[in-house]
Amino acid sequence: MIILKSSQEIEKIREAGKIVAEALMLAGEIIKPGVTTWEINSQIEKVIVSHKAYPSFKNYNGFPAASCISPNCVVVHGIPSKKVILKEGD
């Protein structure tokens, strides 16, 4: 079933997309060897919260972070960690 959106709903979706784009651009700038996935997550969360928004992953079914970061063999929904330090090629 297709649910049609109102112009106000479409504008909210557009605003959310801009916030996500900003967070992803920042993530792309800070991802480098030596950075933890937790640091990346923290910066992503700051961007989202700075727009008075809330990261939808955080606390969803107990997920502890604002983002899912899945380097290498982690297939999906990787939990950011201070122990996961990116290396060259990740």
Regions found by a protein language model. Name each.
Residues M1-D90:
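Active-site neighborhoods and metal-handling regions in enzymes and metal-associated proteins
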